[in-house]
């Protein structure tokens, strides 16, 4: 079994995080939706195919949710040197949380690679607190 390694030049970043509260589409115990916009950039010298992702959501109440799966929003992006893949998705919660994420794939030689997304906070907006999150429109 070969281990995955970080590929120099392959980066992931959170471009934007916005917040939406309530509505009929959200469960009553998780009325807070965070929409995240992410870009994965391949500045390495080789082509990379992304195959899946892993998220670890650490909630302030002590619960830890691990989300793993094949594909990224239903896709397996193939990134040649200099290309980017951007997407958005969301997470619903009842409490504040910190998210750790990574994406895994293979390079053109078939080696397993991964890239880590820097951790980010899903902080529910409250009076007197100025979290680094925007309220989503509509």
Segments from the language model and where they lie:
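Low-complexity, acidic Ser/Thr/Pro/Gly-rich terminal tails and inter-domain linkers that flank the onset
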Residues: 1-31, 131-133
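Terminal connector regions
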Residues: 91-138
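Short, surface-exposed linear segments at secondary-structure transitions and domain or protein termini
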Residues: 59-62, 74-84, 122-132
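Intrinsically disordered, low-complexity Pro/Gly/Ser/Thr-rich segments with frequent PxxP/GP/PP motifs
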Residues: 65-96
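Short acidic, flexible loop segments centered on an aromatic residue
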Residues: 46-65
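Short, solvent-exposed loop/turn segments enriched in Ser/Thr/Gly
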Residues: 31-37, 98-100
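Asparagine-centered strand-capping/turn motif at beta-strand->loop junctions
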Residues: 39-44
């Amino acid at each position: 079994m070969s281990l995955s390694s970080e590929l120099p030049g392959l980066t992931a970043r959170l471009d934007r995080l916005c917040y939406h509260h309530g509505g009929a589409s959200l469960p009553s115990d998780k009325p807070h939706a965070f929409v995240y916009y992410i870009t994965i950039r391949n500045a390495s010298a080789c082509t990379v195919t992304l195959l899946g992702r892993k998220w670890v959501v650490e909630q302030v109440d002590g619960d830890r949710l691990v989300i793993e799966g094949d594909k990224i929003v239903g896709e397996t992006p193939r990134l040649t040197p200099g290309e980017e893949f951007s997407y958005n998705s969301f997470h619903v919660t009842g409490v504040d949380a910190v998210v750790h994420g990574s994406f895994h794939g293979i390079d053109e030689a078939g080696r397993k690679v991964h890239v880590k997304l820097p951790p980010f906070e899903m902080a529910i907006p409250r009076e007197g607190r100025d979290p680094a999150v925007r309220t989503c429109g509509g």
